[in-house]
Each structure stands twice: as C-alpha cells, then as structure tokens.
C-alpha cells in the first residue's frame, strides 16, 4: 500500500526499512526508524522521515486498524531509559525525537506497553554492548508495539523478553484479545 504515498515518501520508507503486510482485519507494519547518529548528524532527515511515516500510517488507518512493531529508535519518556539525565540530547532521546513520538501517538496510536504498564521502571529493549550495560540493566526501551487507538481495548499484554539474548535488542511481543 505504498501507493498511498507520494513518490518521495515511498522512497524514504522503502530505503529505511518499512515492511507492510495486509491481513483481513488489520495492517502489520514492521519498521526500523532511522537513527539520528552520533552528533545528531541525521536528525533533520529523521524528522522528515517521521512525518512521512506518520502520514503513511494514518492513511492505512483510514482503511483498517494498524499494528506497528519495530525499532523506533526513541525512548519516549524519561522512564524509558535508565540514565535519562546523561543521555539528554543524545540520539534517541532528543526533544525533537520525543516530540515526533508524541505526535504519532496523539495522531491515533497507542503504545501498548505503556498502555498497560504506565509507570513500570527498568523495562528496556536495548542495551549497549559496552560497560556491561545489559548485566546492569542500564538500557533503553526503543522497540515498540503500537496499536491503532480503536484497538487499544484489545491489548491483553505487551511483553518485553529481556532474557532472550543474541542481540543488543530483545524481542517484544503483543497479545490481543
């Protein structure tokens, strides 16, 4: 359904890892959001990309509910990373990136994990390979399941499988009624 977007938006989405599967009742969108990079070298590009991605999701959502899963490369709230004070204005925790996440949620999507566990601390999906970060659980929650607001009441559980290793990220799961 990339045909719903302009040519430029399609190119941006395709290049930066968006895969969409259509099912009878919903769309499933898997995404890797561009990282702003050290020194925020790609922050401007990311902001444009985020607008295009949000517009794409909203167009899909007009047709049927949307489930979004993937690495959104943003810790939305201070509770979503261990060391938020020292990471302020680093890639993944800038005011701009967090504002774009807020815009996406406000536009009609629910963060499934925070919907069920609004104040749960220590729930992370990514840890640096340095400084024994995983062992110390000094991580970030940057992998999400987002659900169209109209399906928020169908969220039964949103799971972070922190014990599964093999990557600097861990899997996340979603259970719907």
Question: What annotation goes with each model-predicted range?
Answer:
Residues 159-177:
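Surface polyanion/phosphate-binding segment centered on an Asp-His-Pro turn
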Residues 21-24, 148-149, 174-177:
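Active-site beta-strand termini and strand-to-loop segments that position acidic
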Residues 49-138, 142:
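Metal-dependent phosphoesterases centered on the DNase I-like endonuclease/exonuclease/phosphatase
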Residues 15-20, 141-143, 169-173:
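Short hydrophobic/aromatic beta-strand or adjacent loop that forms the aromatic wall/cage
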Residues 1-10, 14:
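Single conserved hydrophobic/aromatic residue that forms the stacking wall/gate
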Residues 31, 36-41:
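A short, charged helix-loop
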């Amino acid at each position: 359904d990339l045909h719903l977007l302009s040519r430029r938006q399609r190119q941006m989405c395709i290049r930066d890892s968006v895969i969409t599967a259509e099912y009878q009742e919903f769309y499933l969108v898997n995404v890797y959001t561009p990282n702003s990079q050290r020194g925020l070298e790609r922050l401007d590009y990311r902001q444009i990309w985020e607008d295009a991605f949000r517009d794409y999701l909203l167009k899909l959502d007009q047709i049927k509910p949307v489930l979004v899963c993937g690495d959104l490369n943003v810790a939305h709230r201070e509770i979503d990373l261990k060391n938020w004070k020292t990471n302020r204005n680093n890639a993944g925790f800038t005011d701009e990136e967090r504002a774009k996440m807020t815009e996406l949620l406000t536009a009609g999507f629910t963060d499934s994990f925070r919907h069920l566990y609004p104040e749960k601390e220590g729930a992370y999906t990514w840890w640096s390979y340095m400084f024994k970060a995983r062992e110390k659980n000094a991580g970030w929650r940057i992998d999400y399941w987002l659900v169209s607001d109209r399906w928020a009441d169908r969220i039964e559980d949103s799971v972070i499988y922190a014990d599964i290793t093999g990557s600097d990220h861990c899997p996340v799961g979603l259970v719907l009624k």
